[in-house]
Design a protein with these regions (language model features):
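Conserved acetyl-CoA-binding loop-helix of GNAT-fold acetyltransferases
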Residues: 41
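Conserved beta-strand termini and adjacent loop/short-helix elements that scaffold enzyme active sites
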Residues: 29-32, 116-118, 264-266, 307
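Extreme N-terminal starter segment of soluble prokaryotic enzymes
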Residues: 1-5
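Long, charged alpha-helical interface segments
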Residues: 148-175, 274-296, 300-310, 319
Length: 334
């Protein structure tokens, strides 16, 4: 977690430095003798995982207000008073990790963590916190409230999962009789009105003709996802043959999605384990019978999930890394 601290008094700055020694991050002083708060907030909201204000809660609220978008995108925001008495998560308590961070910071300076999320206050299963712990993206953040609201009202909720989930489901959580009856679902192929949690375990294998533009790749990718009902949030990186290292369109496409790119030689691609779609033409050009499937499997160190798909000179495939979800959702659980 990338942390950024800001304080407004000498006493607050000393506390920020103490906290940063335990939970590393940059430390700035705001006000007349330091950085402009608006500039600092704009920059850190875009580049940091957590913003920690040491000062009045009102200062923090006014500073972050113009930048708040959604619980799925916003960084964690925590505020501590300059005396180190209270640590209050203001934003992204679950998905952004602000609740956990507030508790960690409170332990450093012997403050009281003030956790205000209802599920935490009542000890109720927090589906968004569980999603974060299982390394899942939340496809529809606006649906979190339906699951949490039902549990807080004492109602049971039903889940569906495309993987076996080890352990015992939390109180109030039970398997759905059918996938279309689930209140939340662990899946890479979301359909229906449930809250969908998308495991971030997928690698996109890419093949393309020389000179393929980022726009053409984007169009192909959108069609690929639509045809397979595949959630793009599940992809964490992309992979191809080393002959594509200098393709500007491919590089721009991956940058737009914030994906790292792995490149493999033809010899390395031939070592991939599994059954792949063979092409004599691809073999004649690249030295290996398939690029997208083999590259995806190697980068994922896993198994092929969606086989080769081709359109307009672009080939795509998806492989999955190993995934073993469990029902733990709080850090104090074994």
């Amino acid at each position: 977690m990338t942390c950024a601290y800001i304080a407004f008094t000498a006493r607050g700055l000393a506390l920020a430095q103490q906290l940063a020694a335990a939970c590393p991050g940059s430390v700035a002083r705001g006000g007349a003798d330091g950085v402009r708060l608006t500039d600092w907030t704009a920059a850190q909201f875009a580049q940091s995982d957590a913003l920690i204000f040491v000062g009045a809660a009102g200062i923090a609220v006014r500073a972050i207000a113009p930048y708040c978008r959604s619980k799925a995108a916003d960084p964690a925001v925590v505020v501590l008073d300059e005396g180190g008495r209270f640590a209050i998560p203001l934003l992204s308590g679950h998905l952004g990790g602000a609740n956990e961070l507030a508790q960690r910071l409170a332990a450093v300076c012997h403050a009281v963590p003030v956790i205000t999320t209802a599920t935490d206050g009542r000890g109720v299963f927090a589906v968004d916190e569980w999603a974060k712990r299982q390394n899942c993206a939340v496809a529809e953040p606006e649906r979190i409230r339906y699951v949490s609201g039902a549990l807080l009202a004492g109602q049971n909720v039903c889940y569906a999962a495309d993987w076996a989930v080890s352990g015992t489901p939390p109180a109030g959580v039970e398997p759905a009789a059918a996938a279309d009856r689930a209140d939340f679902a662990l899946t890479l192929t979301p359909t229906g009105e449930a809250l969908h949690l998308i495991p971030r375990i997928a690698v996109l294998g890419v093949g393309c003709k020389r000179g393929t533009t980022a726009e053409k790749l984007e169009t192909a990718f959108a069609a690929f996802c639509a045809e397979h009902h595949f959630a793009p949030q599940g992809i964490v990186r992309a992979a191809s043959i080393d002959l594509k290292k200098d393709e500007p369109g491919l590089a721009a496409f991956c940058r737009a999605h914030d994906w790292k790119m792995d490149f493999y030689t033809a010899a390395a691609l031939r070592t991939a384990k599994g059954r792949f779609t063979s092409s004599g033409f691809v073999q004649s050009i690249t030295g290996v019978d398939n690029v997208c499937e083999r590259a995806a499997v190697l980068a994922a160190d896993g198994v092929l999930f969606i086989p080769k798909w081709a359109r307009d000179g672009v080939t795509l495939a998806v492989a999955l890394a190993p995934f073993a979800p469990d029902w733990r959702w709080k850090n104090d659980e074994p």
